Curated annotation (Swiss-Prot):
Molecular-function annotations in GO: RNA binding; structural constituent of ribosome
Matching Pfam families: Ribosomal_S9
The family this protein is said to belong to: Belongs to the universal ribosomal protein uS9 family.
Disordered: annotated segments: 123-143
Keyword Ribonucleoprotein: yes
Ranges of biased composition (kind: Basic residues): 134-143
One GO-annotated biological process of the protein: maturation of SSU-rRNA from tricistronic rRNA transcript (SSU-rRNA, 5.8S rRNA, LSU-rRNA)
Keyword terms of this UniProt record: Ribonucleoprotein, Ribosomal protein
Signal peptide: none
Protein name: Small ribosomal subunit protein uS9
Gene Ontology CC terms: cytosolic small ribosomal subunit
NCBIfam families attached to this UniProt entry: PRK00474.1
Gene3D superfamilies to which the protein is assigned, alphabetical: 3.30.230.10
Length: 143
């Protein structure tokens, strides 16, 4: 019995983490066990579709993608999902298809939006004393 070719990648945004399992299959794409067409909020659904629409659905015809996402808010989770899918597709093509198709995918993704493959490294600034937040100060009175 031969093992099914598969790769595992992750995408991150703020505190949201999405792990994508990409393997040979028949074109199923699921997020937390439900189809990608049911991603909420509906307004951000096309953000999740971006990697699929950029390279064409024909590249997804013979692979299955299962994504598990935890942490963060709705928007962060959507960005983590799209990054995990894009990175998973590139990794799958590098490992099981060929280098040329991997480079084409990478070029298409990075020319459209760099954050599809590279995580956003911005993090919240720590709070300091003398104010309510990182930069906000308490009101000062002179009299």
């Amino acid at each position: 019995m031969s093992a099914v070719p598969s790769v595992q990648t992750f995408g991150k945004k703020k505190s949201a983490t999405a792990v994508a399992h990409v393997k040979a299959g028949k074109g199923l794409i699921k997020v937390n066990g439900s189809p990608i067409t049911l991603v909420q909020p509906e307004i951000l659904r096309f953000k999740v579709y971006e990697p699929l629409l950029l390279v064409g659905l024909d590249k997804f015809a013979n692979i299955d993608i299962r994504v598990r996402v935890t942490g963060g808010g709705h928007v962060s989770q959507v960005y983590a999902i799209r990054q995990a899918i894009a990175k998973g597709l590139v990794a799958y093509h590098q490992k099981f298809v060929d280098e040329q198709s991997k480079n084409e995918l990478k070029k298409a993704f990075t020319s459209y939006d760099r954050t599809l493959l590279i995580a956003d490294s911005r993090r919240p600034e720590p709070k300091k004393f003398g104010g309510r937040g990182a930069r906000a100060r308490f009101q000062k009175s002179y009299r």
